[in-house]
Design a protein with these regions (language model features):
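Calmodulin-binding IQ motif helices
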Residues: 252
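A contiguous loop/helix-start segment that scaffolds small-molecule binding in enzyme catalytic cores
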Residues: 2-3, 61, 72-76, 132, ...
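A generic local structural motif
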Residues: 14-20, 38, 63-65, 121-122, ...
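Class I SAM-dependent methyltransferase SAM-binding "motif I" and its flanking Rossmann-like core
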Residues: 1, 12, 83-157, 199-202
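Class I S-adenosyl-L-methionine
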Residues: 1-110, 115
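Short secondary-structure boundary/capping segments
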Residues: 21, 43, 68, 125-126, ...
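Residue-level signal for well-ordered alpha-helical positions
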Residues: 43-44, 119-120, 176
Length: 252
């Protein structure tokens, strides 16, 4: 018996991996967070499968369902949104499974930041503009940021930032990042990426909060910040396409 933590992607059922879909199709038990994973993703479960929306369940409730499946020798598809390794809250589940001696595997999924970049038709790393992407969040009531991971520290890098779970903290984001990126730095708020009502709000550090308030977006949004978002035409081509680079490959 194995628990499969499956990344379902950001919302679009077509973005789940082949492996993830096959496991959902074969597992007799499927646990999914209905608030983040659309029913269309788990519709592929066997007709006689036990399919449970865990949105209202506690961690103990979820583990009880897994233990019950374990006692019956039934594999479990534990379906999470995006990629389970990023803000997936699987670490505490894995800790419980290890203590119980229950086997598990992780199936990666498409993260919201990758799907959003695709939806926007942009690259997040641009030669001589930004070559780093930082995935982060801001402190909320439920969880503080470890020392050194605050935006006032990360902003010093000048990297492209993908800020998760923080759309209600835009005032703080502006305050912390303007000293490093400037008021006119591009910002894009990606709302419900991969869902039918997906939307993108474009602005700058100085005006994005007002635009998001006008759009009445308060959750399920990802915030991109950084000069690479401008996608201007005046950046250097990647060395990957340089003639000398191509010639060096021929002589390897």
């Amino acid at each position: 018996m194995t628990v499969h933590f499956i990344g379902a992607g950001p919302g679009d059922p077509e973005l789940i991996t082949v492996r993830g879909l096959r496991l959902i199709e074969s597992c007799p038990v499927c646990l999914y967070a209905g608030s983040l994973v659309p029913e269309a993703v788990v519709a592929a479960a066997p007709a006689d499968a036990r399919v449970i929306d865990t949105a209202s369940l506690t961690l103990d409730d979820i583990i009880d369902e897994i233990v019950a499946a374990h006692d019956k020798g039934q594999d479990v598809a534990r379906v999470h949104s995006g990629d389970p390794s990023l803000y997936g809250a699987i670490a505490e589940q894995i800790r419980r499974l290890k203590a119980l001696g229950i086997d598990y595997r992780i199936v990666p999924g498409v993260s919201a930041y990758a799907a959003a970049a695709a939806g926007l038709g942009i690259e997040l790393t641009v030669p001589e503009v930004a070559q780093s992407l930082i995935l982060t969040r801001t402190a909320m009531k439920s969880s503080a940021m470890p020392p050194g991971e605050e935006l006032t520290s990360l902003g010093r890098t000048g990297a492209t930032l993908a800020i998760h779970l923080s759309v209600r903290n835009l005032r703080q984001i502006e305050r912390d990042l303007v000293p490093f990126y400037g008021e006119d730095c591009p910002v894009i708020v990606a709302y419900r990426v991969g869902w039918p009502d997906e939307d993108y709000i474009h602005g700058t550090l100085s005006d994005i909060r007002a635009k998001v308030q006008e759009a009445k977006i308060t959750r399920t949004a990802l915030i991109f910040v950084g000069p690479a978002l401008a996608q201007t035409a005046d950046f250097r081509d990647s060395a990957l396409y340089d003639a000398a680079h191509a010639l060096s490959l021929i002589h390897i």
